[in-house]
From Swiss-Prot:
Name this protein carries in UniProt: Superoxide dismutase [Cu-Zn]
Name of encoding gene: SOD1
Binding site for substrate: R144
Cofactor note: Binds 1 copper ion per subunit. Binds 1 zinc ion per subunit.
Region spans: Disordered: 124-144
Keyword Oxidoreductase: yes
Biased composition (Basic and acidic residues): 124-136
Organism placement in taxonomy: Eukaryota, Fungi, Dikarya, Ascomycota, Pezizomycotina
Sequence positions that bind Cu cation: H47, H49, H64, H121
PANTHER family reported for this sequence: SUPEROXIDE DISMUTASE CU-ZN -RELATED
Length: 154
């Protein structure tokens, strides 16, 4: 079992943690998040970005992690970036907790996401269905108010 954690923070009040667990290279990865400080009753895009570089805030993280050179999509789509985690949904207090299992995201092997950045975006991810070029790259998920680097944990 490999475990990793990402603590997100930024220039906004959005903070939280995301935990990853994977049993083996062929197994799906369990992703659990607890994030607060977002707008109430909102959907906010959450993606794994290519670089673990936050030198200039979340903008240094680069594009979505996309080792297969696909277009942006929903987590359940076969044509999607590895880093496309879709939207988190917030409650009346702007908090979001949840768990998903993802067979594209890996902690083990050559496409490991350890050392890459998770960005919690300021807008809703249109899941690549926005009928424009930017939708196919970013899902039009907007600014990057909070992020953190995924690190191995015990």
């Amino acid at each position: 079992m490999v475990k990793a954690v990402c603590v997100v923070r930024g220039d906004s009040k959005v903070t939280g943690s995301i935990v990853f667990e994977q049993e083996s290279e062929s197994a799906p990865t369990k992703i659990t998040w607890d994030i607060s400080g977002n707008d109430a009753n909102a959907k906010r895009g959450m993606h794994i970005h290519t670089f673990g570089d936050n030198t200039n805030g979340c903008t240094s993280a680069g594009p979505h992690f996309n080792p297969h050179n696909k277009t942006h999509g929903a987590p359940e789509d076969s044509n999607r970036h590895v880093g496309d985690l879709g939207n988190i949904e917030t409650d009346a207090n702007g908090n979001s907790k949840g768990t998903v299992t993802d067979s594209h995201v890996k902690l083990i092997g050559p496409e490991s996401v350890i050392g890459r950045t998770i960005v919690v975006h300021g807008g809703t991810d249109d899941l690549g269905k926005g009928d424009n070029e930017e939708s196919l790259k970013t899902g039009n998920a907007g600014p990057r108010p909070a992020c953190g680097v995924i690190g191995i944990s015990n």
